[in-house]
Amino acid sequence: MTCSSFGKCGSCVLWEMPYDEQLKMKSEKLKEMFSEFDMPEIEVVHGSDEHFRARAEFRVWHEGDKSYYAMRKRKEDGRGVIPIEECKIVDKAIYDIMTPLLKEIEKNDNLRFKLYEIDFLSNSKGELIITLIYHKKVDESIAEDIKKLKEKFKNADFIVRKKGRKYVFDKNYLIEELNINSKTYKYKIIENTFSQPNRQMNQKMIEWAMRNSEDLKGDLVELYCGNGNFTIPLSERFNKVIATEISKESIEAATYNAEINARDNITFLAMSAAEFSKLYKDRSPLITKYDLKNILIDPPRAGLDDKSREFVNEFDNIIYISCNPETLQRDLKTLAKGREIKAFAFFDQFPYTNHAECGVILKKN
């Protein structure tokens, strides 16, 4: 991939390295990081190195009568942002609309004045949610201007935000479709809630988790379930599933997603990992009806805190999806004791960065 922003933008730090060398470098680094553990060869899973991001956020840079998208500078160039002409890592639907959208905004002082940021969310059908974030007072008068944008960009819905206020034109969600093991799953993805940014890699991660859980017995508990991204396909591998998430909005989406995918063996709970851990330890009637031998965790970058790690360690088998190898390494020092690491995968979610997403399957000896 080539991009006119390479060498200027601080996002794609590995821009000078061919993609196959990036994969080799990252996988070798992971191999060294986890050398203390007895585990199989690291499976390297990757997709396209361009047009892979279904979510993107850009600052807006105004100069005279022109406006530009802006990204943070490279570290060696100091703090701040720089204007960019294009971004080749974003989904094709986002890429195609970026320039024409900004040209329309430039023509309208009401839309342009104190526009601070533009966020994009896309789905596999090329539909978009575009969020305009302002550092000014915004009221209903902006509706006519947004209506004109919607007439121009018929595949997009718009959201206008300023501190404490939000206006939606016409909806704040997309329906995503993922093809997993030749079956289509549908997901409601709500703007400003977490969703996996790399659609292609997300499908491959879910397929990997399903493939490596085929022989697991008992029911499944999932922490940090979000909108049911892993929960819904994996529910086909287990008799019953109980899944928790602290975000009520995400739980509402997950419940809806289970319904539209005709999955009736999942119970979603709007609670933190700590709250669920207490229910489990207190042997709540809500919990005792499950045969909970398996747990799936997809925690934030901080990984598991001490209490969560202690709780997860009570389960026979663990499916751990990690967005931070350093905290994964720390957590495995506890979780790998008395368990065999049956599979370890590196998912290259973000080409041209040092980021490495990992998946680990641990089974009790």
UniProtKB/Swiss-Prot annotation:
The keyword ATP-binding does not apply. One of its GO terms (biological process) is methylation. GO terms for molecular function: rRNA binding; tRNA (uracil(54)-C5)-methyltransferase activity, S-adenosyl methionine-dependent; tRNA binding. One of its GO terms (cellular component) is cytosol. The active site is at C323 (nucleophile), E357 (proton acceptor). It is an enzyme of class 2 (transferase). Belongs to the class I-like SAM-binding methyltransferase superfamily. RNA M5U methyltransferase family. TrmA subfamily. This is tRNA/tmRNA (uracil-C(5))-methyltransferase. It comes from Nautilia profundicola (strain ATCC BAA-1463 / DSM 18972 / AmH).
